[in-house]
Amino acid sequence: MAAVMALAVLPRRMTRWSQWAYAGRAQFCAVRRSVFGFSVRSGMVCRPRRCCSSTAETAAAKAEDDSFLQWFLLLIPATAFGLGTWQVQRRKWKLKLIAELESRVMAEPIPLPADPMELKNLEYRPVKVRGHFDHSKELYIMPRTMVDPVREARDAGRLSSTESGAHVVTPFHCSDLGVTILVNRGFVPRKKVNPETRQKGQVLGEVDLVGIVRLTENRKPFVPENSPERNHWYYRDLEAMAKITGADPIFIDADFHSTAPGGPIGGQTRVTLRNEHMQYILTWYGLCAATSYLWFQKFVRRTPIM
């Protein structure tokens, strides 16, 4: 339609070729105006029409983005504060558990219960038994390092020695209960693993023992599988050990006073727990304080953060 109107006002002296060119240009400008919002006038360069509300819309969008970023970044100090508070609760729980274990280990020994199911609630509890060892069926848990019970308690779980060896586990027939249990007699260095090298320490006859009740142990990551065929044990698997020796799946760690001259060194039970929650508390609360300060500078004081 715009092209027809343009032809109507053309001078008559224009050639037909000029009329076609002028009409084509008018048609082209009309299309650009309808599609792209350009305004075209004769003899002028086509320029875009400016929208008065574009600046206001841009400012509103920027304000909305800043508001979202402000509340999103506030999640960082809030989360850090929550994790720090959680670590406070975890530390209280760990201290309570450590105190409970210490009181349990220091308690007076009780007779070994006849019902094995009762042992599930007696881990780390001292028990006393009477009977004799069967040294022909020794098992070896390795590698292990020796622990001095006195230094172990004083130094919160640090190893007393770096010498590698094994724990000697021996079937023990309880004469009063009529059952055979497994007793971890203690540590021997690698050169003394062979029982022929420590015949003096192979206790014979009936003896009274005090030991700490231990439950079965799950294999930890990177720990090899047990090898019963080679008599190499890397973790405490009571069911498998009981099957090999013919004993019941009851396990105790003999205390230090059970040590015989030339035999395994008893008292190798570690009852301390790692308590590093204070480090985590300082880390999370420190992160909360730092990110809260940065958030305040950025969104409250509007100070540019380099």
UniProtKB/Swiss-Prot annotation:
Q: Which gene encodes it?
A: Surf1
Query: GO biological process: any one?
Result: mitochondrial cytochrome c oxidase assembly
Species this protein is from: Mus musculus
Q: Please report the name of this protein according to its UniProt entry.
A: Surfeit locus protein 1
Q: What is the lineage of its organism?
A: Eukaryota, Metazoa, Chordata, Craniata, Vertebrata
Null mutant phenotype reads: Results in smaller animals with mild decreased motor skills, enhanced working spatial and recognition memory, and increased longevity. Increases global and regional cerebral blood flow. Increases lactate levels in blood and brain, and increases glucose consumption in the brain. Increases hydrogen peroxide production and succinate dehydrogenase (SDH) activity, but decreases COX activity and respiration. In the brain, increases Hif1a and phosphorylated cyclic AMP response element-binding protein levels. In the brain, increases resistance to calcium-related excitotoxic brain damage.
GO function term, MF aspect, one: cytochrome-c oxidase activity
- How is the quaternary structure described? Component of the MITRAC (mitochondrial translation regulation assembly intermediate of cytochrome c oxidase complex) complex, the core components of this complex being COA3/MITRAC12 and COX14. Interacts with COA3.
Note the topology in the membrane: Multi-pass membrane protein
Keyword tags:
Membrane, Mitochondrion, Transmembrane, Transmembrane helix
Q: Which family does it belong to?
A: Belongs to the SURF1 family.
- Enumerate the transmembrane spans: 68-86, 280-300
Q: What task does this protein carry out?
A: Component of the MITRAC (mitochondrial translation regulation assembly intermediate of cytochrome c oxidase complex) complex. Regulates cytochrome c oxidase assembly.
Location of the protein in the cell: Mitochondrion membrane
